[in-house]
Amino acid sequence: MSAEAPVLGILCGGGPAPGLNGVIAGATLYALRLGWKVIGFMEGFKYLCTGDVDVVKAHTIDLTYDIVSRIHFQGGTIIQTSRANPRKSTELQENVRKCLRALKVRYFLTIGGDDTASSAVSVAQGMDGNEISVISCPKTIDNDLPLPSDQSTFGFHTARSLGMEIIRNLMVDSKSAPRWFLVEAMGRSAGHLALGMAEASGAHLCLIPEEFKQDEIEFEDVVELVEATILKRLAYGKNYGVCVLAEGLVSKMSKKALYRLFGNREPPTDPHGHILLDDAELARSLSEELLKRLGNLGIRITPKKIGYELRCADPVAFDAVYTRELGYGAIDAFLNGHSAALIVRENGQVKPVQFKDLLDPATGRVRTRLVDVTSQSFKVARVYMWR
């Protein structure tokens, strides 16, 4: 390979999602056919943010045919990921630019959610357009990015499928050793994953933030809905069941409710400023309150979280194909002079969409795709719940 070959740098940011390796493989194999050199930055922006070129080189791998040829079957990511955020300061952004220049990266592919894409674009804005092009492939099991034609984000189908299996087992367990399971499902702002798993498994109740019309909800609002379902089933002689709760309910709670969940302290946040919803222990707090209310009826309640075990599952066929197409689409976009764009799939075609076109003017962040509670799909899911 020529020393003058264009260099493609790839990194993953944010939480894992099934299919990350598929994007890496799809992009790498196509780039190698073009005669490019491909490198992977370990743990996202973590080492790039240091500005230490030697450190970055020590945490960079050459992506070759032998390394990536069969990884699209595998969950996780061979180049690891992190939530390091160069947008925290101009110094961090300049550190990233320094390292990209030192490694002669001409094409920069990031795989992640809106935070990762925003970070990549902010870095590129300080560089000449002929110096580097930036493309992002959107991923999240939350399925909350505003992709065209209601296209799902990659990893969602796999996460929903595995989540369904787990909840289906809990359904059998709840009946065999009578109890209620309160299942807290990942989903920072939207209820797509929780609703998808609940509907597919036939869970008795699912609560998502979108169905609450008020701007803020109280802890008691959620408690009372779950309590009503438990009592309704009890009236039919059924002292067991499964309720799925989107963790995004926490994001919509009032300050009073948040203080209750987080032990009378300010909610902790991640490097991007998002509340650490997992620390709220929503299902556990609800279980404790419901036992106070219903314990005298002999009701048993067990809290359960589903989330981390979904993120690195081997992708189902849909996601394996989808991610390979996204990887191809990223390289095709580079070849056609695109930058500051996301690769999306619409009507069977992969294409670039300018990142700025997906931003919410009010927040400057990528718009969140919420569950449409007026849709037939939501009505179908709801009609089979015990409400």
Swiss-Prot record:
Pathway: Carbohydrate degradation; glycolysis; D-glyceraldehyde 3-phosphate and glycerone phosphate from D-glucose: step 3/4
Activity regulation comment: Non-allosteric.
SUPFAM superfamilies, sorted: Phosphofructokinase
UniProt keyword Metal-binding present: yes
Signal peptide region: none
Cofactor(s) required, per the database record: Mg(2+)
Binding annotation for Mg(2+): 114
Site (Important for catalytic activity): 139
Catalytic activity: beta-D-fructose 6-phosphate + diphosphate = beta-D-fructose 1,6-bisphosphate + phosphate + H(+)
Any single GO BP term: fructose 6-phosphate metabolic process
Protein name per UniProt: Pyrophosphate--fructose 6-phosphate 1-phosphotransferase 3
